[in-house]
Regions:
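Hydrophobic transmembrane architecture of multi-pass small-molecule transporters
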Residues: 86, 103-200, 205-215
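Transmembrane core module of solute transporters
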Residues: 1-98, 207-215
Length: 215
């Protein structure tokens, strides 16, 4: 979207605020509400945020990004904190240090695999989108002729052709991001049925109170 680095960092703050708020909420309601329902809420919020992100465009406002970031942060907070509690609830106290190390390792490996897959798909879909959009760049394109007539593009110079190619690349990258967001939305939705396989912890407070849960 062409935002400066400082603005990008500022737009990421609401997601962290949402995650922090969800963590505080989990600590308050954890003993009273089944943790599996909290994970379900988190997965649903994450899927909702991903769905909203599939509606993004190159003209998306900062408010839309901020609002979506808050929803996504709430979803992540309601997923990982209860999930950690459930994971350690049946683990003997003397195994919690080893369990925390293994839990963090698996989580980091999973995150690395997911990020790598999304980046690979992004690169592939960007190239495919660029090739598809480039097919509309020809002398008989009405939209292109109108853009040239109003001075948006200059096809008579190398600089103008480079600008046109950059715009095609920008549009292709946006489409690729939307495809990634759509895939992540389906991953979140498909993860919801697996919550039924989790056991209800007998004592959430005893598991959540362990210092070994910190990453």
């Amino acid at each position: 979207l062409g935002y400066p680095v400082i603005d990008v960092g500022t737009l990421l703050v609401p997601r962290g605020v949402g995650t922090m708020a969800a963590m505080f909420a989990v600590g308050r309601i954890g003993p009273r509400i089944d943790l599996r329902w909290q994970i379900l809420l988190g997965m649903a919020l994450t899927a909702l945020a991903m769905h909203e992100m599939t509606q993004f465009s190159l003209d998306t406002s900062t408010w839309d990004i901020t609002r979506t970031g808050i929803v996504q942060g709430l979803g992540l907070g309601f997923v990982f904190v209860p999930l950690s509690t459930v994971a350690f609830s049946t683990l003997a106290p003397h195994f919690r240090n080893e369990g925390a190390a293994l839990f963090s390792l698996i989580r980091n490996i999973g995150a690395s695999i997911g990020i790598s897959a999304m980046v690979a798909l992004l690169a592939q879909n960007t190239q495919a989108g660029h090739a598809a959009l480039a097919e509309f760049i020809h002398p008989f394109s009405l939209a292109l002729r109108q853009a040239v007539e109003v001075g948006a593009h200059d096809l008579s110079s190398a600089a103008g052709l480079q600008k046109l190619d950059a715009e095609v690349g920008r549009q292709a990258a946006m489409l690729a991001y939307l495809q990634d967001f759509r895939l992540m939305m389906w991953v979140a939705l498909l993860g919801i049925p697996w919550i039924a396989l989790l056991r209800k912890p007998a004592s959430p407070l005893s598991a959540a109170g362990s210092p070994a849960l910190a990453d």
